[in-house]
């Protein structure tokens, strides 16, 4: 028998095995649900959770340690079994469906085990491959974060990739469902690895100027880091590629015992200090509120103009380049801005690209930028553009 025929037989056998496993898992799921209903009948309480689908997925991936991390509810409880309870039940199943699909794909060897991550972003599903060479880099960084034993690690969008790497061990698989609409109680965090959006935590604009300044005329990373290290509580990070000497460094500060991130965005009279104020949502880069204009005196007119032209019904406005009159293209990075809305909340997203990429034109989607341009200098909590730059947050 020739090799292609053998492959077809193997694929067919895998499909048959998968179908049998699925039917068995679904049958066991139904039996378990009925049993649970009987047990809880006296309490007049019907509870639905993810146990059934997790059981099916574990059946598809025997011997593998499966951990589910979701910031969306994966269970529902109702005083009685009614139509609303069934709707909630279906919602739970729908939320877990990406996990199920991924398990099937791995079981059929459609997607390599170590190359799978599944998460949702604004209701859309993404299948994202992982570059193997990045795994040890990001794993090490995340291990340093975890060594501080934070109470909560909150991640959305592209940041999920980093956390996925950290848990990536032989014989284990991590899957995530991420909902960008998650509202976070900031007081539940022991440490916050993002900027802060709570007005009670953020400093006033005049406080920012006292926190962080560095001379952007320094010629090398070593010089910048030396000056940068003069400030307490800074997280300097680790820089692998000296060619990024013009990249703006990140700093952490503590306000009211909470940590936040500061980003220098260029220079005015050789020194600039700007805090980007925002919360980590679904894009993997900084989401900043419209109130940010109070921190950008030089760009205030421009931002107010953008806000005035912004329509709340628009999901995303195409980004516009922002270059201060005091900045020269030879000296500065280009700053891209886009305005978006999440529910009834309007936000401005800031991120940086190199002058060269700016002049060539670049996609407005930061994730696409990371994929298409190896050299992009991209400011976002997920951090490293294609692994060429990394930092720690411990």
UniProtKB/Swiss-Prot annotation:
The chain crosses the membrane at residues 11-31, 99-119. SUPFAM superfamilies: Homeodomain-like. GO terms for cellular component: membrane. It comes from the Eukaryota. Keywords: Membrane, Transmembrane, Transmembrane helix. It is a multi-pass membrane protein. It is found in: Membrane. Residues 325-377 form the Myb-like domain. This is Myb-like protein R. It comes from Dictyostelium discoideum.
């Amino acid at each position: 028998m020739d090799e292609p025929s053998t492959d077809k037989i193997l694929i067919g056998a895998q499909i048959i095995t998968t179908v049998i496993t699925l039917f068995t898992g679904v049958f066991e799921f139904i039996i378990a649900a009925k049993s649970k209903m009987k047990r809880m009948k006296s309490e007049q309480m019907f509870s639905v959770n993810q146990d059934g689908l997790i059981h099916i997925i574990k059946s598809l991936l025997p011997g593998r340690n499966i951990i589910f991390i979701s910031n969306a509810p994966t269970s529902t409880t109702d005083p009685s079994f009614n139509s609303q309870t069934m709707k909630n039940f279906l919602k739970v199943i729908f939320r877990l469906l990406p996990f199920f699909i991924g398990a099937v794909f791995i079981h059929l060897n459609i997607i390599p085990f170590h190359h799978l991550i599944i998460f949702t972003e604004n209701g859309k599903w993404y299948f994202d491959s992982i570059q193997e060479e990045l795994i040890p880099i990001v794993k090490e960084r995340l291990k340093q974060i975890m060594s501080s034993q934070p109470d909560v690690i909150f991640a959305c969008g592209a940041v999920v990739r980093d956390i996925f790497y950290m848990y990536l061990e032989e014989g284990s698989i991590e899957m995530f469902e991420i909902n960008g609409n998650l509202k976070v109680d900031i007081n539940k965090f022991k440490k916050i690895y993002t900027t802060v959006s709570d007005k009670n935590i953020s400093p006033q604009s005049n406080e920012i100027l006292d926190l962080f300044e560095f001379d952007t005329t320094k010629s090398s990373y070593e010089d910048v880091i030396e000056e940068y290290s003069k400030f307490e509580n800074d997280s300097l990070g680790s820089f692998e590629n000296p060619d990024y000497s013009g990249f703006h460094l990140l700093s952490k500060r503590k306000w009211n015992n909470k940590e936040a991130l500061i980003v220098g965005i260029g220079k005015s009279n050789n020194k600039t200090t700007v805090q980007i104020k925002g919360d980590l949502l679904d894009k993997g880069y900084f989401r900043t509120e419209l109130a940010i204009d109070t921190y950008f005196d030089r760009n205030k007119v421009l931002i107010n103009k953008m806000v005035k032209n912004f329509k709340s019904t628009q999901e995303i406005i195409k980004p516009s380049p922002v270059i201060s009159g005091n900045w020269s293209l030879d000296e500065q990075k280009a700053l891209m801005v886009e305005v978006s809305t999440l529910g009834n909340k309007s936000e401005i997203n800031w991120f940086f690209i190199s002058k060269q990429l700016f002049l060539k034109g670049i996609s407005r989607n930061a994730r696409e930028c990371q994929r298409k341009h190896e050299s992009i200098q991209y400011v976002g909590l997920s951090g490293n553009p294609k692994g060429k730059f990394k930092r720690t947050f411990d």
